[in-house]
């Protein structure tokens, strides 16, 4: 006599950032904690801590709760100061209340971990 097991298989859900990374074939997984600042006019700034989840030689991909829009200017800084770069939002993907963001560096970052 056979019995049938029932239960849910554990399925790891793909992050919203991983879904966006599919549009960037050069994207490599990384895990870099950063301070993200949205650079706005007239001294207004919005900041948050986030983690860069994917990188290419020119772009970074991360999740954000800030109200970001296409072409917004961002500043990315890590805690030890080895990363301090400006980037511009080039893609946004909204998924279940979270926003995946791709931003392109505005200048070459000489010590960026992802090389061509």
Predicted regions and their residues:
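Structured alpha-helical
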Residues: 1-116
